[in-house]
Amino acid sequence: SSVLDGTRFNFTTRVTSDAPSIMPKYQNRYGQGFGGEFKYVDGAGSGVNDGADESWGPMLDGRLIDQFFGKAQPWVAHPNNVKDYFQSGTTVSNNLNMVTSGKGMGSRLSITKEDVKGIVPNSSLAKLAGSLSASAVVNSKLTLSGSMQYTQNKGLNRPENGYTEGNPFMTFTWFGRQVDVASLKNKYYNAGSPYGFADGSLYNWNDNYHRNPYWQQYENPAPDSREHIIGQLTANYVFNSWLSGIVRTGSDSYRQTQEEHFSAGNIDRANASFNGGFTASNARAQETNFEGILTARKSVGKFDFTVNGGGNIRRNDRFANGYSTSGILVAGIYNLSNAGIAPTFTNSETRTAVNSMYGSAVATYDRFWTVELTGRNDWSSTLPKENASY
């Protein structure tokens, strides 16, 4: 922290470590399968209950059973197999603050950069935030002020929400208790094929309902970004001892993009006859407001009167589009020119407006008895013309 010619600087750095705070409780007496039986062949039902993703199989007593990583392997529990999937996350945050002050003027600037390494493998989030506020007393009648906030988020492979293939927690809702996630992780490359066997099939514990959670995170890139800007300007003017006015305008806008890339091998999201698929979406929206208010205050004897009158103009605009295909021709190229299956498109655009007028009158007697009247009328573009006023 330092001070220079009426300007104060402050810089801080913070590093935190992240880890799951609560883990589900699992039983560790029985492994994958049904009715106490299991034998792996292809993880899709060709063996004995090897397509099951539930743990109603043989007791985990060390007997030798064919499993996805080899024949006649010890059938033992891995009590921490879900916990071991997660990694230590870190958050590094740097912040710079600058405050200036002078005769009738002042400002404040804050910039924060934050880099997050997620607890889910190969997930990250980069944040940038800035805010600026300033005010100035122009003269005895006019005061100006304004502020702006900007945020930018850029994520990579952040887990999806809900019961979906893109959420590793969906897999862990089931998951064989004998599965060692270290084995799933260590087979990142096998026989030259990512997460695969020599025959090209994916190295996985179950092929009916789930994918290797490491394969899901490393071979299915999902970038997303969002920018958000809020700004406002205000002017206060004092006409005389009893009349003042305020004019302000503000805007709130954002822009976001999201992509999901599906490698060949996805169960639900990529056509098996092609080399993957993808979805992409874009959206932007803005709300603007312009408001003006006049305020009159007058005292007559024991009576105090306050009258307000003003209006507001609000505009909302939103645009969104997206496209997707479940089949691409060349693996790893996620654009429309590489679509092997005709993509689907979505597009929407909305524009709305609301104009408002409002006022109030307050009369107070002897600083105790008060009578107040208020009124407001709005005109909305979303209503039929004959009913737009309310």
Predicted regions and their residues:
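Outer-membrane beta-barrel transmembrane domain signature of Gram-negative proteins
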Residues: 70-99, 103, 228, 269-368
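Transmembrane beta-barrel strand/turn architecture of Gram-negative outer membrane proteins
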Residues: 1-23, 102-188, 223-256, 277-322, ...
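Short secondary-structure boundary/capping segments
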Residues: 26-28, 161-165, 263-264, 324-327
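Active-site beta-strand/loop architecture of penicillin-binding DD-peptidases
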Residues: 379-381
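N-terminal, polar/charged subdomain of small-to-medium soluble alpha/beta proteins
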Residues: 262, 268-269
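Structural alpha/beta core scaffold segments of enzyme domains
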Residues: 171-175, 206, 331, 344
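Residues embedded in well-ordered regular secondary structure
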Residues: 3-121, 158-162, 176-223, 236-238
